[in-house]
C-alpha cells in the first residue's frame, strides 16, 4: 500500500483533466465513501468510454497540470481515521483503470477488519495490563507488610538478645555455690531459647520479605512489558487507558523503589546490630571464661601445693619413725644379747636402700612390696570406713569435698592401726592362734570402729581442731581394750620376753611407718585428684574460649553474607530504576514522534 502512492504520477488521470475532475467531483458531493467510490468509478468509466469514442489519445493534454507529491509519513500519522480513509480512496482512484470495484470492496473490508483487529487487540492488552497492574499492586502491598513484619521481628530479637546478655552477665557475677546460681542459670537458658526463637522468626521474616520483593519486582516488570506492548495500538480510547495506566505504573515503580530502599536499610541495620549483639555476648562469655580459668588455675596451684606439703610432711614422719625403729632395735639388742642387731642393721639397710632407690628411680620397693596388701586389704577397708565417715559428715552439714577428705584420712589411719594389731597378734600368738582369733578380731574391730567413728564425728562437730588428738587417744584406748579382751596382758616378763616384745614393737613401728606413708600417699592423692579436676575445668574453659572464637568467626562470616544480600538488593533496585528510566525515555520519544 505504501508503493501505491508512487503510482499516482504514473496513472492516466494526471494526463486527462476530465478524468480527474469526474473522480474528485464525485468524492466531494457524497460523504458515503463507498457510494462515492462506486459513483466515481462509474463516472470515470463513462468518461473514459466517451474519450475512446471521440478518439482522444491518452498522451494528449489540453491544459498544463501541476505534479502532486504524495503525503509524507508524518502527515499520514497525523491524519484521523476519516482522513486516512480519504487518502486510501485517493490511492484507489489511481488504480481504477487496472482493478475492478469488487477488488476495491475486498481491500476496504480487509482494512476495516485490520482496524477492528487492532482495536480488539488493544482492548485485550489493556485488560491484561489492568490485571498485571492489580497483581503488582497486591505484591507491592504484601512487600510493604513483609517489611513491617521484619522490622517487628527485629525489635523482638533485639529485646531477646539484650535480655540474654543481661542474664549472662548476672550468671557470670555469681559463684556456683551461691543460692541464686541455679535460678540465674535457668534464666540464661530461657533467655537463650527466646533469643533463638526470635532469631528464627527474624530469619523467616527476612526470607519472606526477600521473596515478596522479588515477586513484586517481577510483577512490576510484567506490567511494564505489557505497557510497552500496549503502546503499539492505534485506538484512541485505548490510548487514553494506556496513558492512565502508564501514570499508575510509574507511581507504582517509584513506590516499589522506595520500599526496596527501606528494606535495604532495615537489612543493613539489622546486620550491623546483630553483629554488635553477638560481639557483646561473646565478650561477656569470654570474660566469664577468663575469670573461671583464673579461678581454676589458683585452685590447681593450691591443691598442688597441698600435695607437695603433704608429701614433705609424710617424708619427715617416715624418717622419724625410721630413726625410732633403729633406736628400738638397738635397745632390744641389750636384752637379746645382740641378736636383734641383725634386725636393726637389716632395717637400717632396708630403709637407706629404699631412700636411695626412691631418689634414683622415683619408686619405693617397700611400697611396691606392700602394694598387694594395700590393694586387697587396706584399700577396701579404707574405702568402707571413709564412705561411712563421709556420709555421716554430710549428714551433719559438712560440704562434700571436706567430708570426703576427712573420711579418706580417718579411714587410712584406722586401717593402718588395724593392720598393726593383726601383725602383733600374728607375731605374739602364732599363725594358728591368729587364724582362730580372726573372727573375734573382726568383731572386736567392728565394735571398735563403731565406737570410734561416732566419737570422731562428735569431736569434729564440737571441737574442730582437737579432733585428731582426742581421736588418737580413743583409738589407743580402744586397742588397749582389744588387747585386754584377747588376753595379751601378762605379768613381769623376762629379758628375753622384753627383747622379743621390743622386736615386735620395732616390727609394728615399721609397718606403722609404711601405713603412715600410705596414708600420706592417699591424702596426697586426694589433693592431686582435686588439682586434676581443677586442671580439667581449666582445659574445659580453654576449649570454651576456642569455641567462642569459632562462634565469633562464624558471626563475621554471616555478617559478610548479609552484606552480599544487601548488595544484591541494591543491584536489583538499581536495575529496576534503570528499567524505569529506559521506559520513561521510550515513552518520551514516542510522545515527541
Swiss-Prot record:
It is a multi-pass membrane protein. This is SPI-1 type 3 secretion system translocon protein SctE. The chain crosses the membrane at residues 330-350, 409-429. Its main location: secreted. GO terms for cellular component: extracellular region; host cell; host cell membrane; membrane. Component of the type III secretion system 1 (SPI-1 T3SS), also called injectisome, which is used to inject bacterial effector proteins into eukaryotic host cells. SipB/SctE1 and SipC/SctB are inserted into the host membrane where they form a pore and allow the translocation of effector proteins into the cytosol of target cells. The core secretion machinery of the T3SS is composed of approximately 20 different proteins, including cytoplasmic components, a base, an export apparatus and a needle. This subunit is involved in the formation of a pore, called the translocon, in host membrane. InterPro entries: BipB-like_C, IpaB/BipB/SctE_N, T3SS_SctE/BipB. The gene is sctE1. Keywords: Coiled coil, Host membrane, Membrane, Secreted, Transmembrane, Transmembrane helix, Virulence.
Amino acid at each position: 500500500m505504501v508503493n501505491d502512492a508512487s503510482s499516482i504520477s504514473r496513472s492516466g488521470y494526471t494526463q486527462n483533466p476530465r478524468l480527474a475532475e469526474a473522480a474528485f467531483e464525485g468524492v466531494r458531493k457524497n460523504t458515503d465513501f463507498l457510494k462515492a467510490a462506486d459513483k466515481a468509478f462509474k463516472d470515470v468509466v463513462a468518461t473514459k468510454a466517451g474519450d475512446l469514442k471521440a478518439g482522444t489519445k491518452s498522451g494528449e493534454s489540453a491544459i498544463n497540470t501541476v505534479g502532486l507529491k504524495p503525503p509524507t509519513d508524518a502527515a499520514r500519522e497525523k491524519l484521523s481515521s476519516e482522513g486516512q480513509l480519504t487518502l486510501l480512496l485517493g490511492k484507489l482512484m489511481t488504480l481504477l483503470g487496472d482493478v475492478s470495484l469488487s477488488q476495491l470492496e475486498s481491500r476496504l473490508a480487509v482494512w476495516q477488519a485490520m482496524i477492528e483487529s487492532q482495536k480488539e487487540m488493544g482492548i485485550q492488552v489493556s485488560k491484561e495490563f489492568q490485571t498485571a497492574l492489580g497483581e503488582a499492586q497486591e505484591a507491592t502491598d504484601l512487600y510493604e507488610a513483609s517489611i513491617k513484619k521484619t522490622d517487628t521481628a527485629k525489635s523482638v530479637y533485639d529485646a531477646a538478645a539484650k535480655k540474654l546478655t543481661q542474664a549472662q552477665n548476672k550468671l557470670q557475677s555469681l559463684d556456683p555455690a551461691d543460692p541464686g546460681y541455679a535460678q540465674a542459670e535457668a534464666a540464661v537458658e530461657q533467655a537463650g531459647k527466646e533469643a533463638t526463637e526470635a532469631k528464627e522468626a527474624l530469619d523467616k521474616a527476612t526470607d519472606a520479605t526477600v521473596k515478596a520483593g522479588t515477586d513484586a519486582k517481577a510483577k512490576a516488570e510484567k506490567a511494564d512489558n505489557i505497557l510497552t506492548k500496549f503502546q503499539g495500538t492505534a485506538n484512541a480510547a485505548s490510548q487514553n487507558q494506556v496513558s492512565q495506566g502508564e501514570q499508575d505504573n510509574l507511581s507504582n515503580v517509584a513506590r516499589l523503589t522506595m520500599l526496596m530502599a527501606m528494606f535495604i536499610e532495615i537489612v543493613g541495620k539489622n546486620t550491623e546490630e546483630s553483629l554488635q549483639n553477638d560481639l557483646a555476648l561473646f565478650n561477656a562469655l569470654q570474660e566469664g571464661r577468663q575469670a573461671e580459668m583464673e579461678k581454676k588455675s589458683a585452685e590447681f596451684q593450691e591443691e598442688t601445693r597441698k600435695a607437695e606439703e603433704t608429701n614433705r610432711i609424710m617424708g619427715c614422719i617416715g624418717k622419724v619413725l625410721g630413726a625410732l625403729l633403729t633406736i628400738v632395735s638397738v635397745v632390744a639388742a641389750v636384752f637379746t644379747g645382740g641378736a636383734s642387731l641383725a634386725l636393726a642393721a637389716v632395717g637400717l639397710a632396708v630403709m637407706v636402700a629404699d631412700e636411695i632407690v626412691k631418689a634414683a628411680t622415683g619408686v619405693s620397693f617397700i611400697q611396691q612390696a606392700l602394694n598387694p596388701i594395700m590393694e586387697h586389704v587396706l584399700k577396701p577397708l579404707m574405702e568402707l570406713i571413709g564412705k561411712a565417715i563421709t556420709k555421716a559428715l554430710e549428714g551433719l552439714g559438712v560440704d562434700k569435698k571436706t567430708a570426703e577428705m576427712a573420711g579418706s584420712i580417718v579411714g587410712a589411719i584406722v586401717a593402718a592401726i588395724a593392720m598393726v594389731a593383726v601383725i602383733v597378734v600374728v607375731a605374739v600368738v602364732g599363725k594358728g592362734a591368729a587364724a582362730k582369733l580372726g573372727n573375734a578380731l573382726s568383731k572386736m574391730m567392728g565394735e571398735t570402729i563403731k565406737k570410734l567413728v561416732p566419737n570422731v564425728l562428735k569431736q569434729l562437730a564440737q571441737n574442730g581442731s582437737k579432733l585428731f588428738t582426742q581421736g588418737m587417744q580413743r583409738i589407743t584406748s580402744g586397742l588397749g581394750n582389744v588387747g585386754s579382751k584377747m588376753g595379751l596382758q601378762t605379768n613381769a616378763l623376762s629379758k628375753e620376753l622384753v627383747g622379743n616384745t621390743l622386736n615386735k614393737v620395732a616390727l609394728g613401728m615399721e609397718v606403722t611407718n609404711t601405713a603412715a606413708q600410705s596414708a600420706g600417699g592417699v591424702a596426697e592423692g586426694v589433693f592431686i585428684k582435686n588439682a586434676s579436676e581443677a586442671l580439667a575445668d581449666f582445659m574445659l574453659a580453654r576449649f570454651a574460649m576456642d569455641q567462642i572464637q569459632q562462634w565469633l568467626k562464624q558471626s563475621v562470616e554471616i555478617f559478610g553474607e548479609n552484606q552480599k544480600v544487601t548488595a544484591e538488593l541494591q543491584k536489583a533496585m538499581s536495575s529496576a530504576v534503570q528499567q524505569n528510566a529506559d521506559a520513561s525515555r521510550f515513552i518520551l520519544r514516542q510522545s515527541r514522534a
